[in-house]
């Protein structure tokens, strides 16, 4: 008699357990779906057929201390060797676009200040890394590459100027006849490019920010390193630090969404060959990939 009375209670517990398991599974599947959607990329941009044919010299094919980075001789040397080039673009206070890596002028120009605070006239008074080379404008670099090899153009934002920078670069590229793609660490710059010129091949730069915290709060490191704003930027490619290339989210972007992978910055021939064997496009420096 006691066992008969306990049976309904047992069945209720069993049903409750099954419902709990089902709810947990549904929640996990929903989270997995949301996570996958957050990593969204755009597959098969028509530019890849050409862009994938090249290796890209990081800030030009520089040879310090004689040929400084992001200098016209470095870009000419890249073209002469048949390489594409990666470069960095800043917006000056007078609207000029300049090719330079850091916002801070100290490392490469040996003066205090921010490049965004300069005019073109002030920019041309500076010299690169103790040489006689000037900091080039974006126009000067584009003139070299227009009938030559492709460019990977990184948008270097500062002080929330992502919209103005993206607009200036897109408008200048409207009349450019050469081959190029655009990348940035700043997802808001890519959102601007997407809105202004959706046809442009665009890429999200990233890395494992937990290894190099870069002054970012933990949540920004997590979001940026795991590419969780892709659903807003919808990049055609992911340019990820080569040493961090095994990261789960990067691999998911490539496998699930078909994103093109670009690897930076490669400094050894064996790493370059490993990168290309994986189908990634290399951005290299400090060696000649064509030398045995």
Regions found by a protein language model. Give the residues of each.
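Short, Lys/Arg-enriched N-terminal segments with co-localized hydrophobic residues
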Residues: 1-17
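Phosphate-group recognition and catalysis centered on beta-loop-alpha active-site segments
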Residues: 16-292
């Amino acid at each position: 008699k006691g066992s008969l009375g306990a049976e309904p209670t047992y069945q209720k517990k069993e049903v409750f357990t099954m419902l709990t398991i089902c709810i947990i599974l549904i929640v996990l599947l929903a989270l997995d779906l949301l996570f996958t959607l957050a990593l969204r990329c755009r597959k098969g941009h028509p530019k890849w057929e050409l862009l994938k044919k090249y290796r890209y010299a990081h800030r030009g094919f520089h040879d310090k201390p004689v040929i400084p980075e992001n200098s016209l001789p470095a870009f000419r040397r890249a073209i002469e060797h048949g390489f594409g080039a990666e470069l960095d673009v800043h917006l000056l206070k007078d609207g000029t676009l300049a090719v330079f890596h850091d916002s801070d002028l100290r490392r490469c120009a040996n003066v205090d200040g921010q490049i965004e605070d300069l005019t073109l006239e002030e920019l041309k008074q500076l010299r690169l890394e103790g040489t006689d080379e000037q900091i080039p404008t974006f126009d000067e670099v584009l003139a070299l590459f227009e009938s030559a090899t492709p460019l990977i153009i990184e948008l270097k934002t500062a002080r929330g100027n992502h919209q103005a920078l993206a607009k200036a670069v897109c408008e200048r590229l409207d009349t450019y006849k050469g081959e190029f793609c655009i990348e940035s660490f700043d997802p808001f710059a890519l959102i601007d490019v997407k809105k202004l010129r959706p046809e442009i091949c665009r890429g999200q730069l990233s890395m494992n920010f937990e290894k190099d915290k870069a002054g970012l709060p933990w949540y920004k490191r997590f979001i940026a390193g795991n590419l969780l704003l892709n659903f807003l930027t919808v990049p055609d490619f992911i340019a990820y630090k080569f040493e961090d290339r095994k990261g789960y989210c990067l691999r998911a972007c490539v496998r699930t969404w078909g994103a093109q992978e670009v690897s930076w910055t490669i400094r050894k021939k064996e790493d370059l060959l490993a990168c290309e064997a994986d189908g990634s496009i290399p951005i290299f420096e400090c060696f000649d990939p064509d030398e045995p």
